[in-house]
A protein has these predicted regions:
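N-terminal membrane-targeting hydrophobic helices
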Residues: 2-145
Length: 145
């Protein structure tokens, strides 16, 4: 079975997920976001806190002021599930409801981002992600033969 290299890499050589696997990642991410919101609700913390902190992980984009490689690294460190997983583990072990709530917000944020197609970044720039290049024009170009 031949693999079409054009379906596996973008024009800059960065690999990305395409087709059905990309759709499954987006559906899975929506499920993570929903589960995180349900967990947050069960913890009984105020929704104003959820709203106030939901976009906090995006403060990592300030790293792009130091260049695309630093920006991508900082963004990716904050946008992988390992961070909130460690925090929720700490919350369970210590009995800290606030740690569990913060982890739920963080999980929800990452899931929501991935559901919308915002993936982990490559060092070439913010628009280059593991879920494809961001932007309507970029996606239209990659979809054409």
């Amino acid at each position: 079975m031949a693999v079409d290299a054009n379906k596996m890499t973008s024009s800059n050589g960065c690999g990305y997920v395409d087709g059905t696997p990309r759709l499954f990642i987006r559906i899975e991410s929506a499920a993570v976001a929903l589960a995180a919101m349900i967990a947050y609700r069960q913890l009984g913390e105020p929704w104003w806190l959820f709203a106030a902190l939901f976009l906090a992980p995006d403060l990592s984009m300030i790293g792009y002021l130091a260049g695309p490689r630093v920006g991508a690294l900082l963004y990716n460190v904050v946008h992988v599930y390992a961070g909130p997983a460690i925090l929720v583990g700490f919350g369970f072990l210590s009995g800290s409801v606030i740690a569990q709530a913060l982890a739920s917000i963080w999980f929800a944020h990452i899931g929501f981002d991935r559901m919308l197609g915002y993936g982990l970044k490559y060092g070439q720039g913010f628009a280059f992600t593991h879920l494809g290049r961001l932007g309507f024009r970029a996606n239209r170009q990659s979809a054409s033969p």
